[in-house]
């Protein structure tokens, strides 16, 4: 009577067919023109957001006026939020796509290079948000009337009213 040795699935080197994810509905590959254009467009959007913040003097320290009237601040808030949302949507898509390669193949140098590039963009987006929150803190008295007027400012209002101290000190 012979007994066949039982194979432990946790220690077996035969993994069978490994799962594959089809991400071609997002981008066709890491080195495709469409992904490179998306990364380039993201850089352009983040640069434009920096220019927007500079042009409108949006920062905690750049505005010498202690408070700005709601009629002047609302279009600035809406403009910032529209631009940021557009950049964040693209950043999230590209970052998730690249991360799917890095997490499944840590030796993929193209994916690692793109991940590093995207990390720098992510830091810039965070710095822009800190700058914007600081400015929102300088106009906190105008926020209620700005939020009542609707639009992107109202849609995101709870983000900036729940933590007013953070907006002032960021």
Features from the language model and the residues they span:
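A well-structured
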Residues: 1-170
